[in-house]
């Protein structure tokens, strides 16, 4: 038997074994919504990107409703630096002036969102790319910082109008959401992707919220990986 055929057979057997083991979980989550915050190495490494989207498509095939909310920090930083703008952060949030919000929207909606949609479609699924501005999905107001700092167009979500997500899922498709929001005046707000994923999951009453990220966990200081909080009670988070 040719070596490549033998390898393909081994991969098939391994995947079949995984599916058999996963059957109880597949039945448990059939028809349930799972929100996935997509970031970290899974977003930048080509092989991981492809395998992650294959897993998302499989989730849809077995009856789950995956909803992807993606970040894009490194790509935004790269584009800003190409334009001669130094990225600035305060307490883990991007300082977003008029020029930066335009770059954020361009990179998130014009590049990253479309790439994810393409990967899902190539893996056999059907994805629809939207931002939080579409269908009035996410409404936000200016975020308030304890020390009074002005972060520019950084928003705090005040409402999630999730009908557009339901429409996409019910049509057998996978929504891919860029974390931007709008307000009654039509302004564009930059939303932290983790926050957006959490708010969307809560509004959808999702069964699970999954974070794909390089961050080791909840950090006391978002800029310091050594500040990992290893144990925390629910009331302390709230």
Regions found by a protein language model. Give the residues of each.
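Nucleotide/pyrophosphate-binding catalytic subdomain
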Residues: 1-238
């Amino acid at each position: 038997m040719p070596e490549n055929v033998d390898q393909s057979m081994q991969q098939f057997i391994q995947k079949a074994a995984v599916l058999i083991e996963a059957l109880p979980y597949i039945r448990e989550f059939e028809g349930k919504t799972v929100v996935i915050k997509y970031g970290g190495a899974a977003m930048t490494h080509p092989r991981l990107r492809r395998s992650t989207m294959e897993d998302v498509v499989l989730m849809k095939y077995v009856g789950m409703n995956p909803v992807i909310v993606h970040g894009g920090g490194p790509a935004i930083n790269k584009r800003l630096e190409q334009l001669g703008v130094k990225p600035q952060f305060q307490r883990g949030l991007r300082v977003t002036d008029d020029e930066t919000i335009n770059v954020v929207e361009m990179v998130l909606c014009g590049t990253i969102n479309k790439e994810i949609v393409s990967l899902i479609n190539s893996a056999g699924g059907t994805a629809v790319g939207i931002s939080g501005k579409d269908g009035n999905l996410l409404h936000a107001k200016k975020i308030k910082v304890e020390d009074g700092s002005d972060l520019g167009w950084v928003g705090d979500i005040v409402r999630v109008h999730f009908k557009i997500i339901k429409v996409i899922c019910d049509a057998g498709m996978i929504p891919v959401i860029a974390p931007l929001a709008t307000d009654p005046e039509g302004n564009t707000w930059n939303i932290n992707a983790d926050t957006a994923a959490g708010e969307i999951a809560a509004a959808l009453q999702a069964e699970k919220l999954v974070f794909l990220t390089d961050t080791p966990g909840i950090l006391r200081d978002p800029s310091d990986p050594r500040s990992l909080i290893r144990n925390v009670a629910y009331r302390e988070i709230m």
